[in-house]
């Protein structure tokens, strides 16, 4: 089973002591820390499909206006390419996935190179950069950094993800 516990931590208290149950959380001082990379995906998924799903998720999470979704998508595509991905063939020589830091770097490069007005450049850098940077700081930043839990482990073992100690971003 996979239980994602957003509030009270009750499942962790009831089931967390069993030998075959792994509890992952946000505070590494209290339990094993959850580590995920939203830019990684399993074999059999095309990188462009994954990028499109990421853009859908970001659109649902953050208010996006004007060209922001297109700018973010371009930054994500460039981040994959800078990690060695061929987006057309959906192959990588290195099997390395980008991180939020990679996307932020590519976002700034892309906006600087673009034909947008200086006001628009500032708006896009400010709006998208701030949102992405919020995912690289504090506990959330720790979750999205480092070696992520393997999909096989996450989806085929008994896992409780305790998010009760983190607020919304």
Region roles according to the model:
Residues 2-169:
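P-loop NTPase motor domains
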């Amino acid at each position: 089973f996979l239980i994602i516990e957003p509030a009270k931590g009750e499942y962790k208290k009831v089931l967390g002591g069993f030998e075959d149950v792994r509890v992952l959380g946000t505070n590494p001082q209290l339990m094993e820390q959850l580590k995920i990379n939203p830019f990684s995906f399993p074999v059999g998924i095309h990188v462009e499909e994954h990028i499109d799903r990421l853009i859908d998720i970001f659109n649902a999470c953050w208010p996006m206006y004007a060209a922001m979704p297109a700018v973010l998508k371009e930054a994500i595509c460039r981040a994959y390419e800078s990690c060695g991905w061929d987006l057309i063939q959906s192959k990588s020589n290195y099997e390395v996935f980008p991180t939020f830091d990679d996307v932020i770097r590519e976002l700034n490069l892309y906006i600087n190179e673009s034909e947008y007005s200086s006001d628009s450049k500032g708006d896009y850098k400010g709006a998208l950069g701030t949102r992405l940077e919020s995912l690289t700081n504090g506990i959330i930043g720790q979750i999205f950094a480092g070696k992520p839990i393997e999909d096989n482990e996450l989806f085929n073992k008994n896992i409780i993800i305790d998010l009760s100690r983190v607020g919304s971003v």
